[in-house]
Design a protein with these regions (language model features):
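Conserved structural position within tetratricopeptide repeats
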Residues: 24, 60-61, 92-95, 148-151, ...
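Alpha-helical adaptor scaffolds
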Residues: 34-45, 112-151, 157-158
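Register position in tetratricopeptide repeats
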Residues: 45-46, 79, 96, 113-116, ...
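Helix-start (N-cap) detector for alpha-helical repeat units in TPR-like alpha-solenoids
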Residues: 29-34, 67-68, 101-102, 123, ...
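Short Cys/His-rich micro-motifs in 6-15 aa windows
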Residues: 20-29
Length: 248
């Protein structure tokens, strides 16, 4: 930890050994930032992405220079299908720390897949169009667009939510349930997903089994996603499939 006033390394004292500034508040803020980061890391490990996002944003509120927290937030956004938001966090991270920063690697790998990035960006634009169709009452058109969007960017959880919401409004509850079960595999404790599932269960009188009804193919797909990790400072966290490194 370095003094924010002069940049000198700090010891255990509440005062900077170089400039004499009281650094007690700085140390407290950085401690809280690291605490929220570690909690966010735990959430990310169990694919509670929305919970991880909330904690990582809190971490950055206390210390915007917390590079591991910002990089992990980018990974969480990527896992949620928000590649543009992920890239933004990594660019900010790189601007704060240009050397020895994993963000540089993430940016490079993402930019190498320009076609995929363009496809993701297009899917987000199409989502906004689908949302506009919903507001104008053109639900059938929105459904067609959202199905295509999910094919292009299967991690875009807000597209799953909007499609499920349309199905609920149209009283097509089993279709909504199917979409929401896919959403829960992206973000296991997402409050919107769980709220919509609860509504489906109330309307149908049937509970949703989120495990035993999975097909073998679905289970293998989920397990493959869970096994995708990377390591930094002896801690294991999720890694987007696009960023997997080949083993020797």
């Amino acid at each position: 930890m370095n003094c924010m006033n002069c940049g000198a390394p700090l010891g255990r004292s509440m005062y900077c050994p170089s400039c004499g500034k009281n650094v007690q508040q700085q140390k407290k803020a950085e401690h809280l930032s690291n605490l929220y980061y570690n909690q966010g890391l735990e959430k990310a490990q169990i694919r509670d992405l929305s919970g991880a996002e909330d904690l990582l944003l809190r971490s950055l509120k206390f210390n915007k220079l917390n590079i591991p927290a910002r990089n992990l937030l980018g990974l969480v956004y990527y896992e949620m299908g928000e590649a543009v938001s992920a890239l933004s966090e990594w660019i900010i991270s790189k601007n704060f720390q240009r050397k020895d920063n994993l963000a540089s690697d993430y940016i490079e790998r993402l930019q190498k897949e320009a076609n995929k990035l363009d496809s993701i960006n297009l899917s987000i634009k199409k989502f906004n169009e689908a949302l506009r169709c919903c507001r104008e009452g053109n639900e059938d058109v929105a459904v067609i667009q959202l199905k295509k969007i999910i094919q292009q960017n299967h991690r875009l959880i807000k597209a799953h939510h909007l499609l499920a919401l349309i199905y609920i409004h149209q009283e097509k509850y089993e279709k909504a349930r199917k979409i929401l079960k896919k959403a829960i595999r992206i973000d296991r404790t997402n409050s919107t997903t769980l709220r919509y599932l609860k509504e489906v269960e109330e309307k149908t009188g049937t509970a949703t089994n989120l495990d035993s009804r999975w097909t073998l193919r679905e289970r293998r797909h989920a397990e493959a996603e869970e096994s995708s990790t990377y390591q930094v400072d002896n801690e294991i966290i999720i890694q987007p499939p696009a960023f997997r490194e080949s083993s020797a």
